[in-house]
Amino acid sequence: MSYINKPGKTSAWRVMTVRQQVSAVLAYGKIETTLKKAKNTQKRLDKLITLAKVDNFNNRRQVKKWLLNTNLFDVDQLMDHLFSKVAPKYEKTPGGYSRVLKLGPRRGDATEMAILQLTDAKYK
């Protein structure tokens, strides 16, 4: 029964979805999505914030590969926002920069929905 958990999308689609959602969370602070996508995006988001805690050329290059333009920021502005405003909040936090809050099933297809948001560093 290994066919049950396969989402039925190509790997390029999954990578692009994660890139879009990571950029949206960094720009807006939170997003509403399905539970499975939120958990998948949370892994990459926490890794990018960990990289952004040390500001050097290599980390900026690696982070830039995962960011996309949003309505508020282009890629360079979003990267500067991450390195100058988001990452310093979590400087002394060893991990757990984001959280997933379950919302319940979506009306229509009963898919489990969730909110992916950045945690505030002062509320441990």
UniProtKB/Swiss-Prot annotation:
The family this protein is said to belong to: Belongs to the bacterial ribosomal protein bL17 family.
Alphabetic keyword roster: Ribonucleoprotein, Ribosomal protein
Source organism (scientific name): Mycoplasma pneumoniae (strain ATCC 29342 / M129 / Subtype 1) (Mycoplasmoides pneumoniae)
Keyword presence, Ribonucleoprotein: yes
Superkingdom per UniProt: Bacteria
Membrane-spanning parts: none
One family name in Pfam for this protein: Ribosomal_L17
Self-association and partners: Part of the 50S ribosomal subunit. Contacts protein L32.
SUPFAM superfamilies, per database record: Prokaryotic ribosomal protein L17
Name of this protein: Large ribosomal subunit protein bL17
Entry's Gene Ontology molecular function annotations: structural constituent of ribosome
GO-annotated biological processes: translation
InterPro entries the record matches: Ribosomal_bL17, Ribosomal_bL17_CS, Ribosomal_bL17_sf
HAMAP family: Ribosomal_bL17 (MF_01368)
NCBIfam families in alphabetical order: L17
